[in-house]
């Protein structure tokens, strides 16, 4: 796979086991799919063709990506808040993207959690969320449309990512959704009840982000480290810098050389206000490089300019960063293939030498 061009230079200035779901049923706000016009930037026209519904793998539970105890009950609410952002954007006169499924995911009581979520900085502002979503949508569609080999897509999400439903996908695409299991199940049930279907061109497989061995879970679902892959990070609960390190270790082991990783790094509470953006990005760049990735960071202002918008104000996005990275290192699967190949060569040489004797 050829080396892909870099879309942005490095920025130097700001730019366990989960508890069961609540027993109380949530009221849904159903939204007809015909309420929105097609979005030409991501899909040809209308909604994606109807096809088989996403299938979830039987993955083990556990906790390779640890989360603080006090944050556990916010996962579902955080995913719902993101869905509300997408629904609100879809209703704008000139939206950056269309998500006709977001309203199906909403519950009437999600607004009561907004203040706490903002105080915890678990999500960016609505303005920045919409920009990041548009940026990721565009780049994802660009990469899969311009490569005949890029058919493994890993979405690292909050469990309510609707990209498998609302974006167009090439034939034989396999989308691996890595997210909190209980949130993913809740979203899948709601979408299924509303009649949402995934394109016939792709299949969606779920791997729990709470799996004790995320790498083994993805391999169990059929992920192939000898084939190119595209990784997308938006919404996956990462509460500490260590959790990001663990995630990058897994991706570095799985991603074939030349694979692409795009997304947004969340804010980590241990990064105090005294830490400036440049030093944070230096630390992130070193972390990516340790796992074999060459990374560039993208200013939020640049994304806004590219879509013809201006940020009303520079909100508190301290510690958040949009990135695009390329894997320069061989995956574990590639290294194993090389090892087996050289072993066969050595065995053949030994047999030839024995015959000569």
Curated annotation (Swiss-Prot):
EC annotation?
2.1.1.4
Query: Mind listing the GO biological process terms from this record?
Result: melatonin biosynthetic process; methylation
InterPro entries noted in UniProt: Ppm1/Ppm2/Tcmp (IPR007213), SAM-dependent_MTases_sf (IPR029063)
Q: Phenotype when inactivated?
A: Reduced plant growth and grain yield. Reduced content of chlorophyll in leaves. Reduced number and size of chloroplasts. Altered structure of chloroplasts. Reduced root length and lateral root number. Formation of hypersensitive response (HR)-like lesions. Early heading and premature leaf senescence. Accumulation of the antimicrobial compounds momilactones and phytocassanes, and constitutive expression of pathogenesis-related genes. Over-accumulation of jasmonates and elevated levels of brassinosteroid. Increased leaf lamina bending.
| Molecular-function annotations in GO | acetylserotonin O-methyltransferase activity
Pfam entry (one): LCM
Q: Where does the UniProt annotation locate this protein?
A: Plastid, Chloroplast
Is Transferase found in the keyword set? yes
Q: Give the UniProt entry's GO cellular component terms.
A: chloroplast
Transit peptide extent on chain: 1-53
User: Where does this protein chiefly localize?
Assistant: plastid
Region span, Disordered: 50-71
Pathway where it operates? Aromatic compound metabolism; melatonin biosynthesis; melatonin from serotonin: step 1/2
**SUPFAM superfamilies to which the protein is assigned, alphabetical:** S-adenosyl-L-methionine-dependent methyltransferases (SSF53335)
Report, as the record phrases it, the tissue specificity of this protein: Expressed in roots, leaf sheaths, flag leaves and panicles.
Which class of enzymes does this protein belong to? transferase
Sorted alphabetically, which keywords does the UniProt record give? Chloroplast, Melatonin biosynthesis, Methyltransferase, Plastid, S-adenosyl-L-methionine, Transferase, Transit peptide
Which reaction is recorded as catalysed by this protein?
N-acetylserotonin + S-adenosyl-L-methionine = melatonin + S-adenosyl-L-homocysteine + H(+)
Q: What else is known?
A: Overexpression of MTS1 in transgenic lines enhances grain yield.
Q: What does this protein do?
A: Involved in melatonin biosynthesis. Can function as acetylserotonin O-methyltransferase. Catalyzes the transfer of a methyl group onto N-acetylserotonin, producing melatonin (N-acetyl-5-methoxytryptamine). Involved in the regulation of jasmonate- and brassinosteroid-mediated plant growth and defense responses.
Instruction: Please report which protein family the annotation says this sequence is part of.
Output: Belongs to the methyltransferase superfamily. LCMT family.
Give the protein's recorded name. O-methyltransferase 1, chloroplastic
Q: Where does this protein come from, organism-wise?
A: Oryza sativa subsp. japonica (Rice)
Organism lineage string:
Eukaryota, Viridiplantae, Streptophyta, Embryophyta, Tracheophyta
């Amino acid at each position: 796979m050829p080396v892909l061009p870099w879309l942005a230079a490095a920025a130097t200035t700001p730019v366990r086991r989960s508890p069961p779901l609540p027993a109380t049923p949530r009221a849904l706000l159903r939204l007809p799919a015909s309420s929105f016009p097609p979005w030409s930037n991501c899909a040809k026209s209308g909604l994606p063709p109807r096809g088989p519904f996403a299938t979830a793998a039987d993955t083990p539970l556990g906790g390779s990506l640890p989360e603080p105890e006090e944050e556990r009950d916010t996962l579902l609410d955080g995913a719902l808040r993101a869905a509300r952002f997408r629904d609100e954007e879809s209703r704008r006169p000139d939206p950056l993207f269309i998500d006709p499924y977001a309203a199906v995911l909403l519950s009437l009581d999600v607004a009561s959690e907004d203040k706490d979520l903002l105080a915890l900085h678990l999500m960016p502002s609505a303005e920045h969320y919409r920009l990041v979503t548009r940026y990721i949508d565009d780049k994802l569609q660009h990469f899969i449309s311009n490569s005949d080999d890029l058919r493994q897509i890993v979405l690292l999400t909050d469990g309510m990512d609707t990209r498998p439903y609302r974006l167009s996908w090439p034939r034989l695409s396999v989308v691996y959704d890595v997210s909190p299991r209980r949130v993913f199940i809740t979203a899948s049930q709601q979408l299924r009840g509303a009649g949402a279907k995934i394109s016939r061109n792709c299949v969606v497989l779920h791997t729990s982000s709470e799996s004790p061995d995320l790498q083994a879970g993805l391999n169990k679902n059929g992920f192939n480290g000898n084939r190119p892959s595209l990784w997308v990070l938006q919404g996956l609960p990462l509460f500490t810098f260590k959790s990001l390190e663990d995630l990058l270790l897994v991706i570095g082991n799985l991603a074939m050389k030349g694979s692409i990783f795009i997304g947004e790094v969340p804010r980590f509470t241990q990064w105090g206000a005294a830490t400036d953006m440049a030093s944070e990005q230096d630390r992130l760049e070193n972390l990516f490089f340790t796992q074999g990735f060459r990374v560039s960071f993208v200013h939020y202002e640049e994304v806004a300019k590219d879509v013809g918008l201006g940020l009303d104000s520079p909100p508190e996005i301290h510690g958040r960063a949009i990135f695009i990275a390329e894997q320069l290192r061989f995956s574990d699967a590639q290294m194993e293939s090389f090892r087996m190949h050289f072993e066969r060569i050595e065995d053949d040489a030994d047999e030839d030498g024995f015959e000569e004797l």
